[in-house]
């Protein structure tokens, strides 16, 4: 019995965790490059990527299609489009979503473990 034959115990949450993890990396890159002249901030539209993945698109392609450049409210003179406060806020919100998704998955694992042990 291969992995593809096993029932999906986590539903869309496994995919959501992957997407949130990738988004965390993109946002961290934006924050790290806040002082880099000409750097263009990007973000992953989490909702669009999740919908695409739910519709059968593989996660990597869903991320590629949902990755967009940010349009700054206040463009800088050096061409950098990172707005640090917005990036930090998006990072924090994404981290909360990541933690909540991970907690749900942990709960599922605990439930399955208890069921297998007969608790």
What feature does the model see in each segment?
Residues 1-119:
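Amphipathic alpha-helical polymerization modules
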